[in-house]
């Protein structure tokens, strides 16, 4: 083994951040965020929207229904929770 291989640190990849709308806040310290993804159809060129709901950890329970939030990928916190709340971008009116 060479010295260079022994002393190098394994770097972590960048964590994914997504913006979405809170659709439920009824669980303790958990919010459900709907993420929208837009893709162009390969052949016809039409913009197609797909929605996905993910659970995110909200430690202080500050987010409410209708808020636009920024969530970041994290280690698995439970069976379904793999995101955490970073900030509330816009409060619901």
Curated annotation (Swiss-Prot):
<dbReference type="InterPro" id="IPR019979">
    <property type="entry name" value="Ribosomal_uS17_CS"/>
</dbReference>
<comment type="subunit">
    <text>Part of the 30S ribosomal subunit.</text>
</comment>
<dbReference type="GO" id="GO:0022627">
    <property type="term" value="C:cytosolic small ribosomal subunit"/>
</dbReference>
<keyword id="KW-0689">Ribosomal protein</keyword>
<protein>
    <recommendedName>
        <fullName>Small ribosomal subunit protein uS17</fullName>
    </recommendedName>
</protein>
<dbReference type="GO" id="GO:0019843">
    <property type="term" value="F:rRNA binding"/>
</dbReference>
<keyword id="KW-0699">rRNA-binding</keyword>
<keyword id="KW-0687">Ribonucleoprotein</keyword>
<dbReference type="GO" id="GO:0006412">
    <property type="term" value="P:translation"/>
</dbReference>
<comment type="similarity">
    <text>Belongs to the universal ribosomal protein uS17 family.</text>
</comment>
<dbReference type="InterPro" id="IPR000266">
    <property type="entry name" value="Ribosomal_uS17"/>
</dbReference>
<dbReference type="InterPro" id="IPR019984">
    <property type="entry name" value="Ribosomal_uS17_bact/chlr"/>
</dbReference>
<dbReference type="GO" id="GO:0003735">
    <property type="term" value="F:structural constituent of ribosome"/>
</dbReference>
<dbReference type="InterPro" id="IPR012340">
    <property type="entry name" value="NA-bd_OB-fold"/>
</dbReference>
<comment type="function">
    <text>One of the primary rRNA binding proteins, it binds specifically to the 5'-end of 16S ribosomal RNA.</text>
</comment>
<dbReference type="Pfam" id="PF00366">
    <property type="entry name" value="Ribosomal_S17"/>
</dbReference>
<keyword id="KW-0694">RNA-binding</keyword>
